[in-house]
Amino acid sequence: MHESYIRIGKILKTQGNRGAVRVLPLTDYPERFKNMSRVQVSLKGFRTFFTVGEVYHHKNFIIIKFKEIESMAAAEKLKGAFLEVGRDELVPLPEDRFYIFDIIGLKVYDTGGRNLGRVTDVLQTGANDVYVVDTGGKPLLIPALKQVVKSVNLTEGKMVVELPEGLEEL
């Protein structure tokens, strides 16, 4: 799936009385916020850019003061909005690593060329991700391990896997 804009955070509420907002990071790279000069804010189908002023971490959140927002009342109107970036602004990943939104929607084939279905979700388990494949019946859970996932071709929208023995019966 090739999204035009990728969500990297969600504004939860205001922070203080000067118009700052508390953001839940939706990215594995929350440090990116400190290096941003502007960010797109999307709320109820409308998008606009804001200039990033002060940024700091507070517990598991990011506090951002946009230069255009001067008051708590103005910041309150942004509650529930998403912070988004274009694909060209994504943090580059190492080779053989992929963004979840690129994996969802891929067609999955076994090494023999049999179509197993489509990736509909990615479970983040801590040890390794697990791809949820819609087979038309019971979902197939495929561990995202090099021994199992033989290739991913985003251009072709295709993933090739070598299923461990018995995995389809689980």
Swiss-Prot record:
Alphabetical list of NCBIfam families matching this protein: 16S_RimM
GO biological process, alphabetically ordered: ribosomal small subunit biogenesis; rRNA processing
Phylogenetic placement of the source organism: Bacteria, Bacillati, Bacillota, Clostridia, Eubacteriales
Tagged with keyword rRNA processing: yes
InterPro entries documented for this protein: PRC_barrel-like_sf (IPR011033), PRC_RimM (IPR056792), RimM (IPR011961), RimM_N (IPR002676), RimM_N_sf (IPR036976), Transl_B-barrel_sf (IPR009000)
Gene source species: Pelotomaculum thermopropionicum (strain DSM 13744 / JCM 10971 / SI)
Assembly information from the UniProt record: Binds ribosomal protein uS19.
Gene Ontology molecular function terms on file: ribosome binding
Location in the cell: Cytoplasm
Domain of life: Bacteria
Domain PRC barrel intervals: 95-167
Record family assignment: Belongs to the RimM family.
Function: An accessory protein needed during the final step in the assembly of 30S ribosomal subunit, possibly for assembly of the head region. Essential for efficient processing of 16S rRNA. May be needed both before and after RbfA during the maturation of 16S rRNA. It has affinity for free ribosomal 30S subunits but not for 70S ribosomes.
Written domain comment of the UniProt record: The PRC barrel domain binds ribosomal protein uS19.
Keyword Nucleotidyltransferase included in the entry's annotation: no
Keywords noted in UniProt: Chaperone, Cytoplasm, Ribosome biogenesis, rRNA processing
GO annotation, cellular component aspect: cytoplasm; ribosome
Gene, per the UniProt record: rimM
Signal peptide: none
Name by which UniProt lists this protein: Ribosome maturation factor RimM
